[in-house]
Amino acid sequence: MGVYTYENEFTSDIPAPKLFKAFVLDADNLIPKIAPQAVKCAEILEGDGGPGTIKKITFGEGSHYGYVKHKIHSIDKENHTYSYSLIEGDALSDNIEKIDYETKLVSAPHGTIIKTTSKYHTKGDVEIKEEHVKAGKEKASHLFKLIEGYLKDHPSEYN
């Protein structure tokens, strides 16, 4: 098994606490509302929403995939960090066992620095193709921009 790690960093002019509430704490409600073509619904299968929780995310009609399951490892509201693994679903190819994600939102003078790390755990000696990672980053970036736009259009929410 190989592990391929990819890091990404980008900025937002939305304050970290507000962004964390929308992007992490209420994503299961907000994303289906603002991007139903991407995510139809999210449901908790086990747990209370904290560490150890298993969620099923059902994708919308605009997606190439049907569903994924996430296992939450940590949510730190004080330090604005979140980690989980994609453990099941058709977004995992035959060559990927799981994908670990870590997100950290860092307060900056004019908003937030968002730092993400993705670790692809492959089966056997399979290598991850750069275009697979790039496509995932583009989808995540598009979804993030939708959330950011929603927060700008609704400044009184998530305070």
Curated annotation (Swiss-Prot):
GO molecular function, one term: protein phosphatase inhibitor activity
An example Gene Ontology biological process: abscisic acid-activated signaling pathway
InterPro entries per the UniProt record, alphabetical: Bet_v_I/MLP, Bet_v_I_allergen, Plant_def-hormone_signal, START-like_dom_sf
Keywords tagged on the record: Allergen, Pathogenesis-related protein, Plant defense
Gene3D superfamilies: 3.30.530.20
GO CC annotations on file: cytoplasm; nucleus
Top-level lineage group: Eukaryota
Family statement drawn from the similarity comment of this UniProt entry: Belongs to the BetVI family.
Subunit-level organization: Monomer.
Name of protein: Major strawberry allergen Fra a 1-C
Organism: Fragaria ananassa
